[in-house]
Swiss-Prot record:
Gene Ontology CC terms, in alphabetical order: nucleus
Organism of provenance: Saccharomyces cerevisiae (strain ATCC 204508 / S288c)
Gene: GAT2
Basic and acidic residues biased stretches: 369-378
Molecular function, one GO term: transcription cis-regulatory region binding
GO biological process, one term: regulation of transcription by RNA polymerase II
Protein name: Protein GAT2
């Protein structure tokens, strides 16, 4: 794996600038600035070298106030000595700052050391660290930026500092306990900070342990809370580290304290959300337990209750499954339920014996319908089986059941066939002059067909029955072998007028094409000459009959 190019300038050999002299190659070791290996995820700290390694006026380096970041290149390990001597000779540099010849072995702590490309052996720049305030150590846990480092000898001690804000990397207890102390002067401020940090971390860890013992804590499946617990545990292990205790500063403690507060708030919010979820689950379970099926809410009456209700019932009523039921029937059916009608039928069948009760099957019995003079919505198509009451809990033989089923289906089919050829009842009479003329001038006996609804048990006619008018919308004919479709719907024209009815597509109005309806008059009367033989009705007017638009104004507009 090739090391990434993170150097501050290109790898090519730069040209010598006029008026600029190259200094001798030097190895710069900063005591406090961290060195981050690009191929590793841990941070390494260089220990201070003995003073004999530094020559010249730069020999005395104050490590406490050294707040500069040194950017340099890796020297070539193969020809370190020769290259340094040649550089001094070629550049004609004053030997005030001689190069330090440090034998660096090939067995370095870093991987891929020999794959790093060679670069000019000179000190590039010494600039202040923009991320740190003055007179503060460079070591910051929350703000570590990768910087380049030089390979050093194997006998130089390195310390690995655990990164507390990375939850994925585990921290071994052996590395923490085996840290070698660094020779540095500790003051009382660092001791106080160390005690405060340990106190805060212990408080947060105890807070997390309190929630671990609680029932509201999540299991190992909840990754968010589990990772927060691990992060707090790593904070406590970091506080016990010897190197962390000796290298922490005031600003670092404030950042650590803020981070602990953030983790504590996050843990509290996660646990609160978990508590709310469990409360919702408990509430849903309680609602499910309280809500029972519909059959459990309605208690079915017992046999004794049925007997008592049968003996105390009033006059019997029955269901009428006609399409147009009377108001009294609707009121009685809504006031009493189906169970009431079944009880009423049981009482009538048991109290009044009939000759057909023994021969007819028990599951389907006909109740004689009583004539009501106020019923104005009776229909001819009412069959003798319109009023049927089914007795529950009766078992019949399969042969009887099939016969009853076939009888019911045959009655329904015949009723549909009878209604197919009959025209619809006119609910809204049109405003055409033709239809109004024939309604007013035609014979009432021929134009108006009065139909009555006879009772099931008597042959007397009801004079208050509804009269249905059947006529052609075009010619007013009331008798025709077949009713045909017209502009006002199905079965609105007689057979003669419907034969001349046709649809054409013709341009009308602002639209490019509209469907126009055209039909021809079959009867031409002397008193109705103003209407031509052909009348064109736009389709949009026909479909808007339910709106406020009247057809008289539209006809006048078309005919003029």
């Amino acid at each position: 794996m090739q090391a990434p190019n993170i150097y501050p300038f290109s790898q090519t050999q730069p040209q010598a600038l006029p008026g600029f002299t190259y200094g001798p190659p030097q190895l710069v070791f900063d005591h406090s600035a961290p060195r981050v290996d690009p191929l590793h995820s841990t941070v390494t700290i260089n220990s201070p070298l003995p003073l004999q390694h530094y020559n010249g006026p730069n020999a005395h380096i104050n490590s406490a106030n050294n707040n500069y970041a040194y950017y340099y290149h890796h020297p070539n390990n193969n020809d370190n000595n020769n290259h340094s001597n040649n550089t001094i000779k070629n550049n004609n540099i004053n030997s005030v700052l001689p190069a330090v010849n440090i034998q660096i072995s090939n067995n370095s702590h870093y991987r891929n050391t020999h794959q790093i490309p060679s670069a000019p052996q000179r000190l590039v720049s010494i600039i202040p660290d923009p991320h740190m305030p003055p007179n503060i150590s460079h070591f910051q846990l929350n703000n570590i930026h990768p910087q380049m480092h030089a390979p050093v000898a194997t006998d130089i001690h390195f310390q690995q500092v655990p990164v507390y804000n990375k939850t994925n990397n585990g921290i071994g207890t052996d590395n923490i306990n085996n840290d070698k102390p660094v020779n540095s002067n500790q003051n009382e401020v660092l001791d106080n900070i160390d005690e405060r940090s340990c106190h805060e971390i212990n408080r947060v860890v105890s807070f997390s342990k309190h929630f671990e013992n609680n029932e509201l804590t999540t299991t190992a499946n909840d990754l968010n809370i589990q990772s927060t617990m691990d992060e707090l545990a790593k904070l406590k292990s970091l506080s016990n580290s010897t190197h962390f205790r000796q290298s922490i500063a005031t600003q670092n403690f404030h950042s650590l304290q803020n981070h602990i507060t953030t983790i504590e708030n996050r843990l509290a919010s996660l646990l609160t959300d978990r508590q709310q979820e469990q409360q919702q689950l408990k509430q849903q379970e309680s609602e499910k337990e309280s809500s029972s099926p519909f059959s459990n809410k309605i208690k079915l009456p017992s046999l004794q209750e049925l007997t008592d209700s049968i003996s105390t019932q009033h006059l019997p009523t029955f269901y009428d499954n006609k399409r147009h039921a009377s108001d009294t029937d609707l009121k009685s059916s809504t006031l009493h339920g189906p169970l009431y009608h079944r009880h009423a039928f049981l009482s009538t069948s048991s109290s009044s014996p009939s000759p057909t009760a023994g021969s007819a099957p028990l599951q389907k019995l006909q109740v004689p319908r009583q004539d009501d003079p106020n019923d104005k919505k009776m229909n001819i198509s009412s069959s003798p089986f319109n009023s049927i009451t089914y007795i529950p809990n009766t078992t019949l033989s399969p042969m009887v059941q099939t016969q009853l089923k076939n009888l019911t289906t045959s009655n329904l089919n015949t009723k549909k066939k009878n209604n197919r050829g009959r025209p619809r009842a006119i609910q809204r009479q049109p405003t055409l002059t033709t239809s109004s003329h024939f309604i007013n001038n035609s014979n009432p006996g021929a134009a108006a067909v009065s139909t009555t609804t006879p009772a099931a048990n008597s042959d007397e006619k009801n004079p208050n029955a509804k009269k249905i008018i059947e006529f052609c919308f075009h010619c007013g004919e009331t008798e025709t072998p077949e009713w045909r479709k017209g502009p006002y719907g199905t079965r609105t024209l007689c057979n003669a007028c419907g034969l001349f009815y046709r649809k054409v597509t013709k341009k009308f109005g602002s639209k490019s094409s509209n469907l126009l309806l055209r039909y021809r008059r079959s009867i031409d009367l002397a008193n109705d000459r103003r209407i031509p033989d052909f009348i064109t009705i736009p389709n949009r007017f026909i479909h808007d009959m339910d709106n406020d638009q009247t057809l008289d104004s539209e006809y006048n507009t078309i005919l003029q």
